[in-house]
Amino acid sequence: MILGIGIDLVEIKRFEQLARQTDNCFAKRLLTSTEYAHYAKLRKDSEKSSFLAVHWSLKEAIYKAVNHIKPLFSQLEITKKNQRYNCQIDPKIELLLSVSYSSNNITAICLAQQTPWKN
């Protein structure tokens, strides 16, 4: 059963200034400790702004799809395995995530569905 669909579109340039912050306060609020550790290893501002934009967009899409749960962004951990983004919020909910990139924008989509085999 589909629980919700969320979509978010962001301009990467909105995250360029945030990626240059020396105190990283935005990144620390948005990312989990594991995500932040990965972010901190990035050297180029373009990589950092893209990382923040993808994570913001995915977390926004997830929030919109499961807004009845009211998850905090800092509790949503985005992982990437085999070129697929993943996030686990509840064993009974499967999140299907998709990200599309262009030179200026990132679009994220989340389809949240109840997993019938885990009721």
UniProtKB/Swiss-Prot annotation:
Give binding positions for Mg(2+).
Answer: D8, E60
Record EC number: 2.7.8.7
Q: What is the lineage of its organism?
A: Bacteria, Bacillati, Mycoplasmatota, Mycoplasmoidales, Mycoplasmoidaceae
According to the UniProt record, what class of enzyme is this? transferase
Cysteines joined through disulfide linkages? none
The record's InterPro entries line, in alphabetical order, gives: 4-PPantetheinyl_Trfase_dom (IPR008278), 4-PPantetheinyl_Trfase_dom_sf (IPR037143), ACPS (IPR002582), Ppantetheine-prot_Trfase_dom (IPR004568)
Q: Where in the cell is it found?
A: Cytoplasm
Q: What species was this sequence derived from?
A: Mycoplasma pneumoniae (strain ATCC 29342 / M129 / Subtype 1) (Mycoplasmoides pneumoniae)
GO terms under biological process: fatty acid biosynthetic process
Q: What does this protein do?
A: Transfers the 4'-phosphopantetheine moiety from coenzyme A to a Ser of acyl-carrier-protein.
Looking up Pfam families in the UniProt record yields: ACPS
Q: What is this protein called?
A: Holo-[acyl-carrier-protein] synthase
Cofactor(s) the protein needs: Mg(2+)
Give me the reactions it catalyses.
apo-[ACP] + CoA = holo-[ACP] + adenosine 3',5'-bisphosphate + H(+)
